[in-house]
């Protein structure tokens, strides 16, 4: 956590640390003033959502679906209900990720979540690029498309 803070990092999404085993991590992130973000899933019981919301700071990551990260053709309908269940127990932002890979999906999620998390779609662009400049252009284009779709969706329009 200290090294991350020294490098300019502000927070970490921790998919592989469970709250019951996070005491050392919580202490380290508190000392380093680093936000820690834990995940809730559609299968999480309400008690677990409360526990995750209490230990997270920065935001709560609502996984749109069960499983591993990666691009998908659609965002699970369970995500909206999970955001609502999480908002019942926290005032922190609730952001949705796992499977968001297109501007249309980002707009859909942006209509009910506080934030949209995109990872694999950007990684795929970088890995598939033939050069660093092509990777940068692809990432910039996707980010701009998602931002525009989110702005339109937040104003009540269609992406």
Task: Label each residue range with its predicted role.
Residues 14-32, 45-51, 69-84, 103-106, ...:
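Active-site-adjacent beta->alpha loops and helix N-cap segments on the catalytic face
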Residues 4-10, 30-37, 54-60, 112-115:
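Glycine-enriched alpha-helix->loop->beta-strand junction motifs that scaffold or abut catalytic
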Residues 1-16, 150-153:
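Active-site beta->alpha loop and helix N-cap motifs at the rims of alpha/beta catalytic domains
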